Amino acid sequence: MPRKGPAPKRPLVVDPVYGSPTVTQLVNRVLVDGKKSTAERIVYGALEGVRDKTQGDPATVLKRALDNVRPSLEVKSRRVGGTTYQVPVDVRPSRATALAMRWLVDYSRVRREKTMTERLMNEILDASNGLGAAVKRREDTHKMAESNKAFAHYRW
C-alpha cells in the first residue's frame, strides 16, 4: 500500500468532434497497440453510421446504449472458512461505465461483420435498443447477483 494515498484521477480530454468525454473514453477503449488515429477512425466511423441509421445525435444514442449496458450489481468472491462465496456488491458509477464500455467493445470485436467500424456501430445500435451481447452480459451479471443474494451479509 503506498503511503501517499491513491493517485489522483487525471482529467479526461474532451473529444474534439462531439465534445463528449464519453467518446474519448470509448476511443481509448478501442485503442490497440497505441494506434490512436486508427481507434479514432473506427469510433468516429461507427458514430457516423449510427447518425445515418437513426437520423439522430450519435452521442445521445451512445449514452442510451451505455445506460442499457451499465450494471448496477456484480458479484465478488469472498473466502469464508474454506468456502468461496460469490457475494453481490453494488458497482461504483465509474466502474459501471468502464465495464459497460469494455463489454461494448469486447462484444463488438467478436461480431461477424466485416469491419470493426460496422461491428461497433451495430453493437451500439443493438445496445441502445436493449438487444445485443453486451446487454445480455449485464443481464447475466444481474442474474448472478440475484441468485447469490443469500450471501449479501458477507459484504465488506
Curated annotation (Swiss-Prot):
Keyword Nucleus: no
Family (UniProt): Belongs to the universal ribosomal protein uS7 family.
GO terms of biological process kind: translation
Pfam families: Ribosomal_S7
Protein species of origin: Beutenbergia cavernae (strain ATCC BAA-8 / DSM 12333 / CCUG 43141 / JCM 11478 / NBRC 16432 / NCIMB 13614 / HKI 0122)
Keyword rRNA-binding attached: yes
Keyword field: Ribonucleoprotein, Ribosomal protein, RNA-binding, rRNA-binding, tRNA-binding
Name of the protein in question: Small ribosomal subunit protein uS7
A single GO molecular function term of this UniProt record: tRNA binding
Domain of life: Bacteria
Gene name per UniProt: rpsG
